[in-house]
Amino acid sequence: MANLGNAWHIPDNPQPQGQASMRLPLEGIEAGTAVTLSNGNQFQAGGAAGNQTQSGSALLLRKAGDPAFQPLPLQFQLTQGNDKFFFAEVPPNTFQAGDLVQYYFKIGYTDRDTTFLHGTNAQSIATVTESEAQADPFTFAIRFPLQSSGPFLSVNSGPFQGRIFENSGHVAVTGPDLAGRPLGSVVTITPPVVEIGGREFQIGPVVSSTPIANGIEVIQTLGPQQVRAQLTFPSPGVMRYEVVDWGGPLPNRVSISSASDGQEHFYGFGEKFDSLDQAGNVVDILTFDNPGNKGGRAYKVAPWFVSSRGYGLHLDSTARSTFDMRAAARGRYELSSHTSTLRFHLVTGPNLKDVVSNYTGLTGRPPLPPPWAFGPWISSDIWRSGGEVRYAVSKFRERKIPVSAFVFDSPWEVAYNDFTFNEVQFGLDGTFEKQNFIGFAKLADMMTFLQQAGLKVICWMAPFVDVNSINEGVAGQNLGKAQNYDLAAAGNFFVRQSPGGPPLVVPWWKGRGSPVDFTQTAAANWLTAQLRALLKACEVKTKTGTEPAIGGFKTDDGESGNGTNTYIPDTAVYSNGLTGREFVNGYCREYLRTIYSVLGQAGLLFARSGFTGTQAFPGCWAGDNQPNFGTEDGLPTVIVAGLSSAMSGFSIWGHDVGGYLNGNVFSPVSPADLFMRWAQFGCFSPIMQMHRQVNPANLRQYPWGYPQAGESIDQNEALDNYRFYTTLHTRLFPYLYTHAKQSQNTGVPILRPLVMMHQDDPNTFTVDHTYYFGDDLLVAPVIEPKVTQRSLYLPEGTWFDFWTNEQRAGKQNITWNSPVPPSEPKSKIPVFVRSGAIVPLILGDAVETLCDPNYINNAGLTTWDGGLEVSIYPAGNSSFTVFDGTVISCAAGGGLTTVTVNSPSARAFLLRSHAARPVSVRRDGAALNEASSAGAFAAANTGWQFDAALGFVLVKFSHPGGATVTITF
């Protein structure tokens, strides 16, 4: 029997203590890199302790294919506890780029048989037979240099060219740079590295090539095997490299890297809360529900980034990935994923708007949601009775707060998720503000009430069907198995624990349940049939027929886990054959795709989770955050989340105004101050929804729940602030909806980080809390308590203060001071308008809802009649095309301003143009009357007035539709 010593070498292990791994470096080894290889040996205590000798121990290594291994003597390194460690250093340039290095250890003993160590990065195998070690050695690859050289094969697509270098396997894309030089921008990816059976190999030189449609197919070396790969342009501005045949065993991990210096910055990655620029960070690409302080975790992730150099990179993997953006990887970034596939996309620009547009052209763009989605929403963590529903809606209308949607968050069902309204719960009365509000005798009554209040309904849901639900303390709730569970289990509609195993049952925050397998068509059809039945049950009578009151679904969850709960274990199995490990991020995409199909463009989603492609199923929100100004868990982090989401293609995005959680509340500021600042950010967000957990001690789930000393629920500054900003958000609808339509057509998001618009200005590279809202508005939310100033960077251009019309020069840091009352609102944030801008708003502030009047079927509510107020900041020639085809153009020069308005329909117009006082104002050549006073101007249908305080010419007229009206002054 062999008398083996207890020796080991496991490259992945962080040994000896304080050393990152037993092979240093573990990865990224180039020809000029010295490599240290250590072995451990137990020299005392029980078991197979033995005395390893330095003189009899050696490292033996060779280039794969060479006939013999060459020895390097091992040297004593150190002693730790019962273990001694020995090492050898492989000198730089011992091997060359592209070499596969094979090695094993010979361990000499005074009291044991000579022991040989071989294995993989994760496993050490001991034997007394040297030939066994030689046949199955440890390996590492000598990577090719970061920079490519030599001959290459190329594929052209318009102004772009894809390249694969024949002698190394480097992949590159070239195209115009910002200066307009053809092929002036070059991005190079080093030959990919893969792990097969615990050993690392590098895809290498091209053996042969064949032209294919839209590209080339190549055969490349990969250690002992060869792979077949394709280089193509699958969509405009996007180059794809994909291995289509591995020619042998599949990898369990793949990685790619590229040179990167300290001047390169990285954005995107999904919805990041910690920083917009992720340079210097290791980014974990894993969907995860981590309420409060999220650190580097995120609900929405994308194996994708946008570089300040004017390109993007997408690693197309649904598995968990790691993006090292110059953290451990120095002078380069490295992307790796635990997957058996390799496909990545280099996305060209060079303009960053074009990068995001090209990326969404490949992965999906958001269809245009219905108009009501862009009005403010009513929501609360829970509605315990129909009386509370009636109270909330009645008070919003009574207190003159415009709203267009009502969200039923959890619980509203009998059980999670049986998609059946709990009519017992909503039949109950409720007493609020010392007044009783009656419940609803029938579901139809509640839906009709909401419809005629001018509201579309959004229903919360999650992808689990429960075997038991938590007790929410509401009447009529089924705490046991949901009534639809057994049917789904019998149909194999749930994700399974293992191949052929039972349904996966996991603990989640609403009980214990099974996730629906959305990769299975039958399962998806089973669930969507229930949702369509729910829509049918919630139909209401419109002016011309019937329509579901429900217009959307709040699609909660879909992440890989929450806290200590794992929702998608590695061993889970989907009907498409993928495991939980392989599809951990892809699950939410199939979930959201399925639910979006129920309503399509007639509705929308409000999704918490997200992944590459889910931006095509609008919209989404920033999840659960805390009501404070903290840079780890509060309002500032949510702004960052919105901007990183935008760089990842998510355009129809919102957040919980006020912060959702009751934890870490407000300190050290007042509740009202935080709520007002969050509402201001909400106004200049695509979706504006107030939502928070319920606290029985207050009414802070409502905008009137923040009275300060000397104020009442009916009259308080926070309520006035919310009313003003929800009204402004509603009035901004023509501007906002136009940009939502632009997102549908181009993928360019509504929120835009400054760097997206000014990538040639390094001052914008790390700006986290100032952004463009569409093309023309620049917004800087206040992110500190009790302040009336805000420092911000104004990018290049001339800017006008939205509130005062003060003109500011760009490309400088400024300190903005809030205008003093009595101008409304009392509390303001920096908002600037770009010189040359044309900004359409709803005329007047009386609109109560953006729902279609045919749906509402209630003449008592004020809806938009099409009237437009247009703010114009003349600078040369500019124009704005409203979503309905209305074109407003402005030409300014030589002391004359000409505004032309082409509208497809008749409507009232109010033009507000920044200008000096004119001598006259003319419509189509005919002079208009100047109003003698503000009152006279308000009463007139046609005329003009000069606002000397703000420097605006105001012009009112009625447009006949189907014609062009010209205004000159």
Segments (PLM) and residue ranges:
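Glycan-association/targeting regions that enable binding to alpha-glucans and other polysaccharides
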Residues: M1-F152, S157-Q161, S168-H170, F883-G895, ...
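Generic detector of short, aliphatic-rich beta-strand segments that form the cores of beta-sheets
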Residues: F138-F140, F344, I829-V833, A963-F969
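Catalytic-domain carbohydrate-binding cleft regions of carbohydrate-active enzymes
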Residues: P176, S209-T210, I219-P224, P236-K828, ...
